[in-house]
Amino acid sequence: MAGNDWINSYLEAILDVGPGIDEAKGSLLLRERGRFSPTRYFVEEVVSGFDETDLHRSWIRAQATRSPQERNTRLENMCWRIWNLARQKKQLENEEAQRMAKRRLERERGRREAVADMSEDLSEGEKGDIVVDHSHHGESNRGRLPRINSVDTMEAWMNQQKGKKLYIVLISLHGLIRGENMELGRDSDTGGQVKYVVELARALGSMPGVYRVDLLTRQVSSPEVDWSYGEPTEMLPPRNSENMMDEMGESSGSYIVRIPFGPKDKYVAKELLWPHIPEFVDGALGHIIQMSKVLGEQIGNGHPIWPAAIHGHYADAGDSAALLSGALNVPMLFTGHSLGRDKLEQLLRQGRLSRDEINSTYKIMRRIEAEELSLDASEMVITSTRQEIEEQWRLYDGFDPILERKLRARIKRNVSCYGRFMPRMMVIPPGMEFHHIVPHDGDLDAEPEFNEDSKSPDPHIWTEIMRFFSNPRKPMILALARPDPKKNLTTLVKAFGECKPLRELANLTLIMGNRDNIDEMSGTNASVLLSILKMIDKYDLYGLVAYPKHHKQSDVPDIYRLAAKTKGVFINPAFIEPFGLTLIEAAAHGLPIVATKNGGPVDIHRVLDNGILVDPHNQESIADALLKLVAEKHLWAKCRANGLKNIHLFSWPEHCKSYLSKLASCKPRQPRWLRNEEDDDENSESDSPSDSLRDIQDISLNLKFSFDGDKNESREKGGGSHPDDRASKIENAVLEWSKGVAKGPQRSMSIEKGEHNSNAGKFPALRRRKIMFVIAVDCKPSAGLSESVRKVFAAVENERAEGSVGFILATSFNISEIRHFLVSEKLNPTDFDAFICNSGGDLYYSSHHSEDNPFVVDLYYHSQIEYRWGGEGLRKTLVRWAASITDKKGEKEEHVIIEDEETSADYCYSFKVQKPNVVPPVKEARKVMRIQALRCHVVYCQNGNKINVIPVLASRAQALRYLYLRWGMELSKTVVVVGESGDTDYEEMLGGVHKTVVLSGVCTTATNLLHANRSYPLADVVCFDDLNIFKTHNEECSSTDLRALLEEHGAFKA
């Protein structure tokens, strides 16, 4: 292609740089001046959303080529590259539009089906927009208090709370968290969320009625970060709390508690923490149990003080909080801060990356699944703004605003929701600490003076900033954000550089975190910073723009004060801002604001009315708003006054009052067996039950000897009854039956003594075991389960004979199938201490008390997992879904999925799969249930031939945590034995503080069938480099080889 010099001009137009551009040439925004260039408009549209840095670099290299022919060839290739990028972007946009249309149809269909199920008693009241908040348990909120706006009301409320002594757990996992000198902006993980959770913990700990607050995070003992992040515990002293902490206890107050998990001696990004979440959950569980006992001794009369709530912040902490709340049976709260689906849609709209590339970079699908689980498990979701609910949470399968209003209306009328649940969305704006704010008492109409009297030196950070300016007395436009593309700082610099009146009237200060060397920054942040530096050079902004390299967190108030002293303006031009805490800080220092119209700033501006909202994509709008506030003194003064007048509405006491009032509306929950023990003062104990007469009587009272439950009988007589009612009836019946045991204590004692001497009274023997082996090999009994069991038994034969090791069988089978397996393989039920059945839906223990029924079901385990169990309403929806699979696939000759009533149980609905290859992946089944507000855990098992549906927080891994909580079974002294693959809950069994042995060559057939079409690859959630996960060397591994492997990895001493 000869003579194509036009290409260079074309690229110059795209990049707006190069020798062909001079000062007389118009800016990119020709439309500002009333002229319109179709060519320029096309160029802007083509490269919209693409990073210009790479294009600029390629263009420079092409320009430097001496040979005209080679230069033209390179430039032509660049044009084709740009065209291809635009084509890919358009293709991605079309695919995304189709996906969104499909999603809308699925949601509408799910909503119609849910409404149809509940149509028996619909009324006009459900059709209105009911705004009264109720808990999902149907309790009224008469005890909830109005918003406090006066000192008298606040004092009255504080006096009312003094009798309470709450223990609250907050979780925020990623970033670097400490109480003082926070390194905000150090990296993308250490931002506003870190400051928010620290200040929230500190403020809650200062409130009346709150005894202790623990902020759980990751312990980082790495040479690349400060030593303080490796300290196990850090106290957060309260600020200005003379009137709020009248009664201090030994362990009261707020604390940062750092739990070790993940790579040791290494600080890693949040995207790499997902495989280590189970390890954190196990460590946090141990801390909470220990702290509950300590607090019980101090303020609970010897009874454990369980958390009033566990509050997860961001998706990773939400996932952890869900597992912890399920293990402890306590309420969960969630705050998203930044949501995965919203980020995914933004990245797809930009067109730079495909969906697979986005997932690979950000682990976005794992993050979204964690957020969906948080919706499933949360009693309440706390948001900063209404926009977060209406535009971001509604993107999720588990939340539908329309269906949520209908469910709320039914709860208000005390009408059944047929097993459907929706978390309550609560808007509680973040608070702010005002103790460090020094009001500006000077004459606001006078010229700013900087240390002219030398009575007190100016803050050091003022000098650092003003050294950049040729005229430091001009009003300062202040932006405080890390150099992240979504913060949109490049558009701000471009708007400032292209608006001559603004440059003449004001200076620009960019506080972009801390840096030592640009080359050592992350690639994205370095790219943004380089772009800004190039624009400063391009527009010749030297002497007009400050960009200091370092600042401390304690310098931030002084930076705001400097901007206010110069009668400046604070700007947040982010493309979307979840809340905008810096806007509140700026307002508190008397700074008017210019902020993005997308997200939380809309709500802040509605309350404060102290500035102007702008379109972050329109640099002309940004420049005009800044110029207006800087040039019009009366407007500036009005915005300043409005902000200072209304800022008290964002104080931390106000936030905490709303927080605690909402928390009071949640139904209290705690481990059921401990609650019953506390009701009986004669037999109450602070610790888990011990192996004594008291425990044997408890077992007889609280555990039903059974081999095959009467599951179908309750369904025939009225399956709509709540699981609580059925459990209570069973327990009452067993109570009546066991009266004879209570009347004969002497006989019971002699039985216990005899059984103990003969080693027959084994239950609950798992407390006495030094090591527990959990066999969770997911294959048919005839296909390797029996061989695996015998191999493990043989590997620890000596310890097994001594009784120092115990065994648990964890499978998808029900208790009938397990008994058949034991009989057929000539194994004794007492070879195992416990049986986790139905994928975690049931828990049994072996017993010596009855040869006919050698299994004891733990009814309290049911009370632990029944949270949000949909019961008969869920079962009917599952049956309808199973029937729809047949219709959609056109398989008229036989059903693809049929209900298996024989193997179903009260807390596990089972389905037989006739054609595993036809059934949609498990993620689709979970999606269908969530769209209809049904919360459950769907597990594809037995190589795809069976589906188990159990309560949302039930699983085999959670059952192990229950055994730790109730019986003290040490998870760190547990070995889980699995195959190379397994059921769809396989990944949950791998991570944690326990050791995991992967048997080579076992359960290999399930890999492609069950784990195809996963939402995310297994490597995103399992760290196979973990030292606690080890694999046998070959398929022919003998029991001797297994023993040697266990000794090598520290399970046994050699």
Swiss-Prot record:
GO molecular function: sucrose-phosphate synthase activity
EC annotation from Swiss-Prot or TrEMBL: 2.4.1.14
Region annotation (Disordered) ranges: 104-125, 674-693, 708-727
Biased composition (Basic and acidic residues): 104-115
Pfam entry (one): Glycos_transf_1
Catalytic activity annotation: beta-D-fructose 6-phosphate + UDP-alpha-D-glucose = sucrose 6(F)-phosphate + UDP + H(+)
Gene Ontology biological process terms, A to Z: sucrose biosynthetic process
InterPro entries xref list: Glyco_trans_1, SPP-like_dom, SPS, SPS_C, SPS_pln, Sucrose_synth_GT-B1
Keywords (A to Z) from UniProt: Glycosyltransferase, Transferase
Protein's UniProt keywords contain Cytoplasm: no
SUPFAM superfamilies: UDP-Glycosyltransferase/glycogen phosphorylase
Keyword Glycosyltransferase appears in the UniProt entry: yes
Modes of activity regulation: Activity is regulated by phosphorylation and moderated by concentration of metabolites and light.
Pathway annotation: Glycan biosynthesis; sucrose biosynthesis; sucrose from D-fructose 6-phosphate and UDP-alpha-D-glucose: step 1/2
EC primary class: transferase
Superkingdom, taxonomy of origin: Eukaryota
Quaternary structure and partners: Homodimer or homotetramer.
Role played: Plays a role in photosynthetic sucrose synthesis by catalyzing the rate-limiting step of sucrose biosynthesis from UDP-glucose and fructose- 6-phosphate. Involved in the regulation of carbon partitioning in the leaves of plants. May regulate the synthesis of sucrose and therefore play a major role as a limiting factor in the export of photoassimilates out of the leaf. Plays a role for sucrose availability that is essential for plant growth and fiber elongation.
Sequence similarity: Belongs to the glycosyltransferase 1 family.
Protein name, as recorded: Probable sucrose-phosphate synthase 1
Gene designation per UniProt: SPS1
